[in-house]
UniProtKB/Swiss-Prot annotation:
Active-site residue numbers: 11, 89
Protein name: 2,3-bisphosphoglycerate-dependent phosphoglycerate mutase
Catalyzed reactions per annotation: (2R)-2-phosphoglycerate = (2R)-3-phosphoglycerate
Record lineage: Bacteria, Pseudomonadati, Pseudomonadota, Gammaproteobacteria, Enterobacterales
Xref: HAMAP family: PGAM_GpmA
GO molecular-function term, one example from the UniProt record: phosphoglycerate mutase activity
Pathway(s) this gene product operates in, as recorded in its UniProt entry: Carbohydrate degradation; glycolysis; pyruvate from D-glyceraldehyde 3-phosphate: step 3/5
Any one of the GO BP annotations: gluconeogenesis
Gene3D superfamilies: Phosphoglycerate mutase-like
Function: Catalyzes the interconversion of 2-phosphoglycerate and 3-phosphoglycerate.
Residues the entry annotates as binding substrate: 10-17, 23-24, 62, 89-92, 100, 116-117, 185-186
Family the UniProt entry places it in: Belongs to the phosphoglycerate mutase family. BPG-dependent PGAM subfamily.
EC number(s) recorded for this UniProt protein: 5.4.2.11
Annotated site (Transition state stabilizer): 184
Gene behind this protein: gpmA
Amino acid sequence: MHIIKTVLIRHGESQWNKDNRFTGWIDVDLSNQGYSEAKRAGQLLKKYKFIFDYGYTSVLKRTIHTLWVILDQLNQTWLPIQKVWQLNERHYGALQGLNKNEAIKTYGYDTIQKWRRSFKDIPPKNNKNDLFLGTNDIRYKNIETNTLPNGESLELTANRVIPYWQKYIEPKIYNNNCIIIVAHGNSIRAILKFLNQLDDSEIFNIEIPTGIPLIYEFDNNIKPIRYYYLSE
């Protein structure tokens, strides 16, 4: 049986990860630690001799810069890259910009955990004048305004991630291309839930670490055979 490998990576630690703030669609860069994580991920993929055909990121710089660093380590900076908003992090609505501990004080631990981890619960939405809306940006100028979120559940995130996966990424995998996708904790959780056919409760406790390659091995019909994190 022929095995096709796809690599999923959550971006390296961002500055707001470090500061313990809800980030969502806010375009913050990697921290120094995040750049180091991306470099290590690239070195690890080089050790296992990965050669990619296509790369995908969100339109947020923490994923773009992570992939740049990885490809530099692999000497594959020529790789065609698609940057798409559908792979963006979940939009955290009115939580964006808040320190997570302060949010817990305001809303309560159980409520915050439900908003963060459940499949269907949506955090409070923000309005078009909110400082941390994240969508009032030139990169989204060609997207219909009513398409852009102002607060999402994981389910709503999956509703944009999975159709893109099925339409654009799956055919590439089916044609035996090696793909690398650098995305976000929740966009990757959405893909993982879809590929592994997890029910809503099973996704609750799944956490995606920053900067560690997650390898999916598929058969010829794009059915997952196994998945694992790459290690030293």
